Amino acid sequence: VDMLANIGQHYGEISSNPYKPMFNRAVQAPYPPGSVFKLVNGLIGLEEGVVTTSTHYPCSMGYHFGRNKLGCHAHKSPLSFEESIMMSCNAYYCYILRDLLENKKYGSIGIAMDKWQEYVKSFGFGQKLGSDFPSELGGFIPGSGYYNKVYGKGGWKATTVISLSIGQGEIGTTPLHMANLCATIASRGFYYIPHIVKDSDNVSIDPKYKEKRYTMVDTTHFPKVVGGMYRAVNSGFGSGGTASIAAVDGLEICGKTG
């Protein structure tokens, strides 16, 4: 309390601290979201119809394209949609992203890329969520303009950006963005802007914090992802579920490893 009350005289000490106590990583630091982001691409794939719960894809220790490979760990093959979440298969989501970006209904990869970006932003990514945390960072979700600038128009294709399928590459998200994604899935398709104060006597709470914000993915698709998350945790050791360690007897827990 004394430190907070007299922060001015301690500012030099605080600002030079190598652990940066004034830097709130939860809302100010962008990170690649990793495999948790597969849930977003899976939901977009379901909405766009490029994948269903009965779609099976093979995985031979990764996704192979030309002489290149985006690697994966050892697990059964082929996998269904739920199993791809349960076992966190990289190749499965490479197939989904490639089918999204090469979808002929969009006419060009640039248009398809921007549609993907629009979907992702509807989950709150690539922008400030609008929370009451100070100095919130918006993160970054790339679109065709970014890749045209880097590679030149016509100089890139789906496999150029294939790492986006597993939450790597140029994506930048804050931990708050990721927590919000989990809340969105738990709510089956909508989220509230994260905020600190829920209610307070004689204080008017901004109504924006009570507004449901839906993604562009139909709510009927979310239980399909939840099913895979449930199996990731509760299928038992030796099943291939990557989150078995999170299981707790007597509780129904869903999860996704990153």
Residue locations for each model-derived region?
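Beta-lactam-recognizing serine transpeptidase/beta-lactamase-like catalytic domain environment
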Residues: 1-35, 40-258
